[in-house]
Regions:
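S-adenosyl-L-methionine-dependent methyltransferase catalytic module, highlighting the catalytic core
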Residues: 2-28, 32-45, 49, 114, ...
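Conserved SAM-binding loop
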Residues: 53-166, 228-236
């Protein structure tokens, strides 16, 4: 699997530093983007609903309650798409977001990092528009594989980062709005935020999972806005090997 090995060799990555002008407005931009306070971010949230619906689709079809873990849960927007679970845990580096969310009662535990989770197994691990941000993505995916219960699945949605349609999409919406508001080039912020392309994410998923299925919002992966992956049958030897090499 030379292509997968080549992709894995590019990790861990180093996130590009933001220039001072971007750091000065980053927190406010992040808040407005999260809350959909601008026309562009509001439109983006409507488009992202496709990912939320795909990720949650299996939960509505389950006949028994499930144990679910969400990676990068933010302020718990995704739980609006999920039926009640037996257990719903989340991982969020900005722990104050889920803790202060009006939907906090829907979850059991909130962790800052996935490494805090011990002695747990989940039927479902879900994530929406998060994996493109992780500088050490293979470690996160390997840990997810080890946390899955027998017959479990990981379901993730990602933007089609690295494709022309995705570039045109944000360039004509958020990019134009960002330049009008701040006089700055949005691509600098995107390079800081999105360190992984959709192709790289797919490569990592296929390395650690034997059964990976994909759907796209678009004509094909190379001409799409978003992608959804359903991952089953983790290769436990490969997943564990990531952590054995770091000991």
């Amino acid at each position: 699997m030379p292509n997968a090995e080549r992709i894995l060799s590019s990790f861990p990555k180093v996130r590009p530093e933001l220039p001072e002008a971007y750091r000065a407005i980053y927190a406010e931009h992040y808040r407005r983007n999260r809350e959909g306070l601008s026309p562009a971010s509001s439109l983006s949230q409507k488009m992202e609903a496709w990912m939320h619906r795909r990720v949650a689709r299996d939960a509505a079809e389950r006949k028994t309650p499930s144990r679910t873990l969400e990676i990068g849960a933010g302020n718990l927007n995704h739980v609006l798409y999920e039926p009640d679970s037996e257990i719903y845990d989340v991982v969020e580096a900005l722990i104050e977001l889920p803790e202060k969310s009006p939907r906090r009662h829907r979850i059991r535990h909130a962790y800052r990092t996935i490494d805090e989770i011990q002695n747990e197994k989940y039927d479902r691990i879900v994530s929406i528009a998060v994996f493109e941000h992780f500088c050490d993505l293979p470690v996160t995916v390997a840990k997810c594989g080890l946390l899955l219960a027998s017959g479990g699945q990981m379901r993730i949605g990602i933007p089609s980062e690295g494709t022309i349609l995705w570039r045109i999409g944000w360039g004509l919406t958020t990019g134009m709005e960002f330049r009008a508001r701040h006089g700055l080039n949005y691509s600098v912020l995107m390079r800081h935020e999105h360190v992984n392309t959709a192709k790289e994410i797919e490569g990592v998923l296929r390395f650690f999972f034997r059964d990976v299925r994909r759907e796209v919002l678009g004509l094909m992966p190379a001409l799409s806005f978003y992608q959804f992956f359903e991952c089953r049958e983790p290769d436990f030897q490969r997943c564990q090997g990531v952590f054995d090499r770091t000991r």
